[in-house]
């Protein structure tokens, strides 16, 4: 079977034909912030930002403010001439209005005679009284009046163009609300007083600025003078300002004048005291509230009372108590009372430190000793020193006479009953003893007897030596010398 293919073409029946939308204008291509203003035709920026494009046929408005000297930032079309003047739309409109007003002022209204002359052609004359000459002159006059037009006016000069009123508020585009009576030149009493007050305030501020400038110049010149004077003193010394020694007559005269000039500006006595008080008052008046607050703060005293008498000390900064009574303030946390010791309590205020229990310098606890001294060796009991009466002094050991000395094994002094070894100072170092004699002396029995003259004798060995006599201890005689006592 043959198949028949039928192609059905689509139709637009029953469908809504879409209405072509008008292409929306593109927005401005300003890069610093998004701008929703439409672009100018053939440009990429709006009228406000068209100056970003250097190739655009626009330039900055040529209007310059008379108040602050700033130029209008709006865009204006470039003129045909390179150095031509071009204004934005707002300033062009204001320029046209000002020019129109200027033309009205320069062209006064028609005078009465001119109006009567123009209306005389419509006046009716009496019948029969008009002559051909008069009718001919009347016709020529009407033709002359008809030929008279505004084109015969004088051209506008440069002086008649609008330059801008310095007192107007037309400098800013946003100044829409203007006072229509601002330039009237007629003021009420209140307005005159207000204007004069503003001018006086302005004049006062200018005087203050000028005074500050003069003060600055004075300080600068004084600083230079002191610097030059210091350099002069370092270079030449102070002899030129103290005495006329070594100076010529002319130099002495100049020195005298210099001293007079130095004393001329100085104040003495009551004048100096009054000048000082005046200077302090001026400082208090000029420094303002800060200086007054400082003086008020310095006059505050402590609020504590001791025996019903108020404390006369000045209070600490930002507090109402002095350093002695600061602990009475329950709100402060910078001071604590010293705990002292158990026997003697101490309530002296101490600044809070890193330690847990701050103490005053009198009750400060020292840390334990880090250095331990070395232990001293103890002396044995057998080597303890004997009584000082058993030893001879340096004066007693001086030899006065040469007497024989007898050595014995034992020394027995009658009266003391205490054995004492022989002193090595009584032996002659030139004496040499054999070993057996030393042993006999150390071990054998013997006695050393002291005679009445103070010499010692030895029993077994008869060795004669010179010795110093013992000092005799006893009662003093009349001449101050001790009386000798015999020792048997």
Curated annotation (Swiss-Prot):
Region (Required for interaction with other NSL complex members): 308-364
Quaternary structure note: Component of the NSL complex at least composed of KAT8/MOF, KANSL1, KANSL2, KANSL3, MCRS1, PHF20, OGT1/OGT, WDR5 and HCFC1.
Residue positions, PTM Phosphoserine: 147, 149, 168, 172, 175
Cross-link (Glycyl lysine isopeptide (Lys-Gly) (interchain with G-Cter in SUMO2)): 78
A GO biological process held by the record: chromatin organization
Top-level taxon: Eukaryota
Subcellular location: Nucleus; Mitochondrion
Modification Phosphothreonine occurs at: 131
Database matches in InterPro entries: NSL2 (IPR026316), Potential_DNA-bd (IPR025927)
Disordered: region residues: 127-182
Function: Non-catalytic component of the NSL histone acetyltransferase complex, a multiprotein complex that mediates histone H4 acetylation at 'Lys-5'- and 'Lys-8' (H4K5ac and H4K8ac) at transcription start sites and promotes transcription initiation. Required for NSL complex stability and for transcription of intraciliary transport genes in both ciliated and non-ciliated cells by regulating histone H4 acetylation at 'Lys-5'- and 'Lys-12' (H4K5ac and H4K12ac). This is necessary for cilium assembly in ciliated cells and for organization of the microtubule cytoskeleton in non-ciliated cells.
Primary localisation category: nucleus
UniProt cross-references to PANTHER family, sorted A to Z: KAT8 REGULATORY NSL COMPLEX SUBUNIT 2
Species for this entry: Rattus norvegicus
The protein, known as: KAT8 regulatory NSL complex subunit 2
Composition bias type Basic and acidic residues, residue spans: 135-144
Keywords, in A-Z order: Chromatin regulator, Isopeptide bond, Mitochondrion, Nucleus, Phosphoprotein, Ubl conjugation
A Pfam family per the record: zf-C3Hc3H
Chain intervals with Acidic residues compositional bias: 167-178
GO cellular component: actin cytoskeleton; cytosol; histone acetyltransferase complex; mitochondrion; NSL complex; nucleoplasm; plasma membrane
């Amino acid at each position: 079977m043959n198949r028949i293919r039928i192609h059905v073409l689509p139709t637009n029946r029953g469908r809504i034909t879409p209405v072509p939308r008008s292409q929306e204008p593109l927005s401005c291509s300003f890069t610093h912030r998004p701008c929703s203003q439409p672009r100018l035709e053939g440009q990429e920026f709006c009228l406000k930002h068209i100056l970003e494009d250097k190739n655009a046929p626009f330039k900055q408005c040529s209007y310059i403010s008379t108040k602050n000297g700033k130029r209008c930032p709006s865009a204006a079309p470039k003129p045909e001439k390179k150095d031509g003047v071009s204004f934005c739309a707002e300033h062009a409109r204001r320029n046209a209005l000002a020019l129109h007003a200027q033309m009205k002022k320069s062209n006064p209204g028609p005078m009465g005679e001119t109006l009567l002359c123009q209306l005389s052609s419509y006046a009716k004359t009496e019948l029969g009284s008009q002559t051909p000459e008069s009718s001919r002159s009347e016709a020529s006059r009407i033709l002359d009046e008809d030929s008279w037009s505004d084109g015969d006016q004088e051209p506008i000069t440069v002086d008649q163009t609008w330059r801008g009123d310095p007192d107007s508020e037309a400098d800013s585009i946003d100044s829409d609300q203007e006072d229509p009576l601002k330039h009237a030149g007629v003021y009420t009493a209140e307005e005159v007083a207000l204007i004069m007050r503003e001018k006086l305030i302005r004049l006062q501020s200018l005087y203050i600025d000028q005074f500050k400038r003069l003060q600055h110049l004075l300080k600068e010149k004084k600083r230079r003078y002191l610097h030059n004077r210091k350099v002069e003193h370092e270079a030449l010394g102070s002899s030129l300002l103290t005495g006329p020694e070594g100076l010529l007559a002319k130099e002495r005269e100049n020195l005298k004048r210099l001293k007079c000039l130095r004393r001329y500006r100085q104040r003495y006595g009551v004048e100096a005291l009054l000048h000082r008080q005046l200077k302090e008052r001026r400082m208090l008046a000029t420094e303002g509230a800060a200086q007054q607050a400082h003086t008020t703060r310095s006059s505050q005293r402590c609020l504590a009372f001791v025996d019903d008498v108020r404390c006369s000390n000045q209070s600490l900064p930002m507090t109402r108590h002095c350093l002695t009574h600061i602990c009475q303030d329950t709100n402060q946390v910078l001071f604590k009372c010293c705990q002292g010791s158990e026997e003697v309590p101490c309530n002296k205020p101490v600044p809070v430190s890193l330690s847990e229990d701050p103490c005053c310098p009198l009750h400060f606890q020292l840390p334990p000793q880090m250095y331990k001294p070395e232990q001293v060796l103890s002396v044995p009991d057998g080597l303890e020193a004997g009584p000082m009466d058993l030893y001879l002094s340096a004066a007693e050991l001086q030899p006065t006479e040469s007497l024989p000395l007898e050595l014995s094994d034992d020394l027995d002094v009658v009266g003391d009953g205490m054995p004492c070894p022989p002193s090595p100072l009584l032996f002659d170092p030139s004496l040499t003893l054999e070993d057996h004699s030393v042993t006999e002396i150390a071990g054998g029995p013997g006695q050393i007897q002291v005679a009445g003259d103070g010499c010692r004798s030895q029993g077994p060995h008869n060795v004669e030596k010179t010795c110093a006599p013992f000092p005799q201890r006893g009662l003093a005689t009349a001449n101050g010398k001790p009386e000798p006592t015999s020792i048997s």
